[in-house]
């Protein structure tokens, strides 16, 4: 397993349309292992293969990226002090994913992206989706998804079409986000 470099805007590869996976082999398994390691290291909750420079229709998602062996996390807010139990990892792999049935009802989540670091914006997407995908063995799965999982899968699937979350923003908001990113890079 290896941590791969995450490509960032304005890298033109991020605008590339990814191609379907046809070979479910050891090379694919290695890619997926590397993607999880890269995503956890970043840290993030989702990663598309194109974000590590591989134009294949492969996504990894884990909405529970915390280390299960970690000590409870101390938290202070609203004058209260308490501890959170760390959550367990739930790694999921989506190969050649498709959205079959997006709802007409929409929800808004604040999104960020490992390829657009330090930038966050509210994006509106279908609240529920029916998704179909293949696993590492090529077996087909189908599932109804909602909430953060539906949003995250749609965000990652956008990468497969060369679309970034900032592309869903108005031109003004997108330009402001890109200027902010440029400033952050100059300051670093």
UniProtKB/Swiss-Prot annotation:
EC number: 3.5.1.88
Cofactor(s) the protein needs: Fe(2+)
Domain of life: Bacteria
Keyword set, alphabetical order: Hydrolase, Iron, Metal-binding, Protein biosynthesis
InterPro entries per UniProt: Peptide_deformylase, Peptide_deformylase_sf
Keyword Protein biosynthesis among UniProt keywords: yes
Active-site residue numbers: 156
Gene Ontology BP annotations: co-translational protein modification; translation
Entries under CDD domains matching the protein: Pep_deformylase
GO molecular function, one term: peptide deformylase activity
Gene3D superfamilies linked to this entry: Peptide deformylase (3.90.45.10)
Pfam family, one: Pep_deformylase
Catalytic activity: N-terminal N-formyl-L-methionyl-[peptide] + H2O = N-terminal L-methionyl-[peptide] + formate
Region feature Disordered, mapped onto this chain: 70-90
Keyword Metal-binding: yes
Binding site for Fe cation: 113, 155, 159
Enzyme class: hydrolase
Co-factor: note: Binds 1 Fe(2+) ion.
Family recorded in the similarity comment: Belongs to the polypeptide deformylase family.
Function noted in UniProt: Removes the formyl group from the N-terminal Met of newly synthesized proteins. Requires at least a dipeptide for an efficient rate of reaction. N-terminal L-methionine is a prerequisite for activity but the enzyme has broad specificity at other positions.
Protein name, UniProt field: Peptide deformylase
Taxonomic placement: Bacteria, Pseudomonadati, Pseudomonadota, Alphaproteobacteria, Sphingomonadales
